[in-house]
Amino acid sequence: KAKVYLFDDNLTKKFGNRSNQRLKNIQEIPKIKFDSIIVSPGIDVLKCKLSKFLKKNKSKIYTDLDVFYSFYKNKSITITGTNGKSTTAKILHEVLSDQMYDCRLVGNIGNPILCEKKITNNTFFVVEASSYQLDYSQLFTSKFSAILNISPDHIERHRNLKNYISAKFRLLDSQSRESI
């Protein structure tokens, strides 16, 4: 049975004064032995309040994309790039939906990938993936992937263009020969 804990920089603001053994403050987190750590894409592991702890446990960090992939292997088309991700993902979603596919548009586009419901064996996903989501991903791969373009962006997060490009290309790192 898994033990799941939640942390937020401002527990009181998010959860009030409710006492809950699953909510942990910043002093408690480093004392817990974790098998896996799922980090929200918006969290900069190198700059957040838990950066020292997260750097030490980097091999245990997974993303929302990794959790998704563990349930829905080979059920997605993933689009990334600096510009045009949303437009391309929307057009692709419309084309597939017009062909009567049960297709969901998820990811960085504003529809959280882990919030989809009523998923069947015929459900297919068009995923817009940001460099933030791909940066710490360890498991995620997509049946079909596209990197549209790359130009300097989010350097404040990735620190340099090489790291930004590396985050984008993580999408292709674990693709099989059968993937496109």
Feature roles, as predicted:
Residues 7-10, 39-43:
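Structural motif
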Residues 12, 25-27, 63:
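A diffuse structural propensity rather than consistent per-protein peaks
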Residues 3, 20-22, 60, 102:
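Conserved beta-strand segments of alpha/beta enzyme cores
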Residues 2-16:
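NAD(P)-binding Rossmann-fold cofactor-contacting core
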Residues 29-35, 41, 45-179:
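Phosphate-binding loop of NTP-binding sites
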Residues 5, 25-29, 38:
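Glycine/alanine-rich phosphate-binding loops at beta-alpha junctions
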Residues 9-10, 18-21, 58:
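Short linear motifs in intrinsically disordered/low-complexity regions
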Residues 16-32:
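Glycine-rich, highly charged phosphate/nucleotide-binding loops
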